[in-house]
Amino acid sequence: MTAIDLSSYAGLTAMVLLTINILVGLLISVRYSPVRSWPHRQIPVFDIHNWTAYIALALVGLHPTILLFSATAKFRWFDILWPLGSPGQRLYNCFGACAFYLLLVVVITSYLRRRIGRPLWKLLHYLAYGVAALVYVHGTLIDPNLKNEPTDFLDGEKVLVELCGLLVIAAIIVRIRYGYSRAAARAQPGTSHAWFLDTRRVNSHTPALAAAD
């Protein structure tokens, strides 16, 4: 297994974790409660949401760093931090670098949420969707072998990225539609929302990604 292969696997794992993170964040944003939906199961949704973000951030940073140990890739530190000078596929590499920097902002501001205030945190938290978009575009278009070959959209790795992207898009659409229906339900007295998390419980945690409601 080459350094390029390891870098590719790190990137794919980060992408899957980010997908899980976004999906869990969307559930948190509607105050979904697994305990109420499945009384005999206690799923730590906040822990899952936080740790998938932290591990994904580490893997996104590791993903290009591994290329420093590849004689074929010919990447330098500066190429990783500023991909406009990278050996090839500069635009796609820039997408990946921007995703890392935005993800770093989202995670750091989540730690500082109480200091910066909820309104600013919530606004910055929406950058998570930009992170996801950049990751999916980067993962779909870049050549995993770094040979500038045309994209094979039916390649196994590409299909995985495409499916994750479509899943997140579908979940966001459902979330938006639900937001409209919930707004309409609020106007009707006696509507039950027993399967949502208590608002105080949501606000007492600091989720790392995509849980802004």
Language-model segments: what does each one mean?
Residues 1-213:
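Membrane-embedded alpha-helical bundles that constitute the cytochrome b-like, heme-associated redox core
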